Amino acid sequence: MPTPSMEDYIEIIYNLIESKGYARVSAIAEALDVHPSSVTKMVQKLDKDQYLDYEKYRGFVLTSKGKKIGERLVFRHELLEEFLEIIGVNDENIYDDVEGIEHHLSWNSIDRIGDLVNYFKDDDSRVKDLKKVIKESDQQVNETAEK
């Protein structure tokens, strides 16, 4: 199983390859706000652990194992963003919140969150009811804060 740091790299590499057809060390370093030498070290580790095939000066590609993990990590990230949106988290907080929690949830928890997201998506009235509850809760918090 990859470490949280390895997951971050695999997710970025997967997204870059999906969007551009390739992933360069410089783009990965920029996306993760790390030094290119750190990316090179991690790429070598991911190669050793068979998540990607790396040839010095020639680049790298994800292995089938790396692609499978990458797909699952992107799914997890998107699912958590959707979940936080449904439960009314402010848009400006969603990305950072997902980054803060995604590595700390088991896949069982992710699957249950997926079930919950599907439950809400299956019937728009459920989302409306939840938004009503959130609005009432926010009003109570504001009233309490004003006292």
Swiss-Prot record:
PROSITE patterns: HTH_DTXR. The keyword S-adenosyl-L-methionine does not apply. Keywords: Activator, Cytoplasm, DNA-binding, Manganese, Metal-binding, Repressor, Transcription, Transcription regulation. InterPro entries: DtxR_MntR_Metal-Reg, Fe_dep_repressor, Fe_dep_repressor_sf, HTH_DTXR, HTH_tscrpt_reg_MntR, Iron_dep_repressor, WH-like_DNA-bd_sf, WH_DNA-bd_sf. Mn(2+) 2 binds at E11, H77, E99, E102. GO terms for biological process: intracellular manganese ion homeostasis. Mn(2+) 1 binds at D8, E99, E102, H103. GO terms for molecular function: DNA binding; DNA-binding transcription factor activity; manganese ion binding; protein dimerization activity. DNA binding is strongly activated by Mn(2+). GO terms for cellular component: cytoplasm. Its main location: cytoplasm. Residues 1-63 form the HTH dtxR-type domain. Gene3D superfamilies: Iron dependent repressor, metal binding and dimerisation domain, Winged helix-like DNA-binding domain superfamily/Winged helix DNA-binding domain. It is found in: Cytoplasm. Homodimer. Belongs to the DtxR/MntR family. HAMAP family: HTH_MntR. Central regulator of manganese homeostasis. This is HTH-type transcriptional regulator MntR.
